[in-house]
């Protein structure tokens, strides 16, 4: 796992790396939430972190190729949540505003890239709904492993879709978010959504057209 995550710090490829005391060092030995997240970081290093993140992925792929395992390996690249608020990235000519901790698309709609030479057709793009519970059945299907019937799995495999088959895509997703942080005094948020609508379980039962 590699992260472009707070604290935003120089990477080994950054000029400032040798002269920099990582702000996360301030948290060593911390015993409570405030001590563990007591850092000051600098957004200027976000670009360096993304580039180093990309470099590490490249090294993994190169090693798989050296071991002649590339065509036997499914690589799944996925984000866990939106980018830190305050960070604005570009995707083509479109601005992508960080929305980590929010239940809008900027906080919950994240990248998912699946790559497997010889198995997943190149340039395949899908707009299917996928959530984290779908990874287990997808990976077991890719590995040709059957889950015992005693296991109750909420997820749906999206392996057929990424390999050019029809599959059985989701009609909806259920989302539950509990900030669970003394610094973020916000209520639990629940919603269900499909590709067009999002329904929140708030007092107003807010229905939003996406």
Question: Which residues fall in each region the model found?
Answer:
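Active-site-proximal cap/lid insertion segments
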Residues: 1-136, 140-153, 189, 197-202
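A broad structural signal for alpha-helix termini and local helix breaks/kinks
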Residues: 143, 162-163
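Charged (Asp/Glu and Lys/Arg) segments that form or flank catalytic channels of large polymer-
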Residues: 158
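Segments of small-molecule ligand-sensing domains
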Residues: 162, 179-181
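Basic phosphate/pyrophosphate-binding loop/patch that engages nucleotide-derived ligands
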Residues: 166-169
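WW-domain-binding short linear motifs
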Residues: 171-175
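Short beta-strand-initiation
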Residues: 185-187, 194
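Conserved small/polar residues in nucleotide/adenosyl-binding loops
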Residues: 208-210
């Amino acid at each position: 796992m590699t992260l472009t995550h707070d604290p935003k710090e120089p990477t080994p490829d950054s000029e400032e790396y040798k002269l920099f005391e990582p702000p996360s060092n301030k948290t060593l030995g911390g015993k409570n939430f405030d001590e563990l997240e007591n850092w000051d970081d600098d957004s200027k290093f976000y670009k360096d972190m993304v580039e180093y993140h990309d470099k590490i992925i490249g090294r993994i792929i190169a090693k798989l190729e050296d071991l002649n395992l590339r065509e036997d390996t499914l690589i799944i690249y996925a984000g866990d949540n939106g980018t830190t608020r305050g960070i604005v990235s570009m995707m083509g000519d479109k601005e992508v505003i960080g929305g980590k901790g929010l239940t809008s698309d900027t906080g919950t709609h994240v990248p998912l890239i699946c790559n497997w030479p010889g198995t997943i057709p190149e340039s395949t793009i899908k707009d299917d709904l996928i959530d984290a519970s779908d990874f287990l059945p997808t990976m077991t299907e890719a590995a040709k492993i059957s889950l015992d019937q005693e296991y109750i799995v909420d997820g749906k495999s999206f392996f057929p879709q990424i390999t050019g088959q029809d599959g059985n895509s989701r009609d909806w997703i259920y989302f539950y978010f509990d900030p669970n942080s003394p610094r973020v005094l916000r209520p639990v948020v629940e919603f269900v959504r499909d590709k067009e609508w999002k329904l929140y379980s708030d007092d107003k039962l807010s229905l939003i057209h996406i």
